[in-house]
């Protein structure tokens, strides 16, 4: 009475684990591999372009009664036809990186690193948000994703390299001052 159920459970686990690894594992077949480190923080997103040694820090949301401006949202730029390893981390509480068009959502958990592997197949603009209730300004924790041509991506990265504020990789440091870009600027590496 126990042998058959145990065999069924073990076989279902084995097949489920194999399928999950195929779905969530690194993708193949694109022209280029890109790694982007994404930090969730109350209440904004920071993007490290680790291959390029530059970063973008999001300004923390602080509601003042006026509508937010989409132009001020942090934007993650990705080149088209690339395999992207999105490395997810959190500076404070659990957040959830979600771009509905990518059909995948993953939590950012303090002290833990998660990954999302995506392949960028078409140029376009996409909306992203935190999908985990993370505090009083959670609803303002929005970001944009722009999938652009390789030339536009290179131009964007070069513009970041020209600005000393964006040089280096933003690490785990965090200062929770509202309505300020309070993440300390990293030392150039």
Question: Each predicted region: which residue ranges?
Answer:
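Non-transmembrane, membrane-proximal soluble domains of secreted or membrane proteins
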Residues: 1-189
């Amino acid at each position: 009475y126990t042998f058959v159920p145990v065999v069924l459970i073990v076989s279902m686990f084995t097949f489920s684990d194999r399928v999950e690894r195929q779905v969530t594992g690194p993708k193949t077949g694109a022209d280029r591999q890109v790694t982007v480190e994404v930090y969730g923080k109350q209440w904004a997103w920071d993007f490290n372009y680790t291959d390029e040694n530059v970063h973008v820090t999001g300004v923390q949301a602080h509601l003042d009664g006026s509508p937010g401006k989409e132009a001020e949202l942090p934007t993650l730029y990705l080149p088209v036809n690339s395999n992207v390893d999105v490395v997810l981390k959190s500076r404070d509480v659990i957040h959830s990186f979600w771009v509905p068009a990518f059909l995948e959502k993953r939590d950012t958990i303090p002290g833990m690193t998660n990954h999302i592997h995506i392949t960028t197949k078409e140029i376009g603009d996409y909306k992203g948000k935190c999908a985990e209730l993370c505090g009083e300004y959670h609803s303002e924790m929005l970001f944009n994703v722009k999938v652009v041509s390789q030339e536009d991506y290179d131009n964007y990265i070069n513009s970041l390299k020209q600005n000393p504020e964006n040089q280096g990789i933003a690490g785990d440091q965090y200062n929770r001052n509202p309505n300020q870009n309070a993440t300390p600027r990293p030392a150039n590496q």
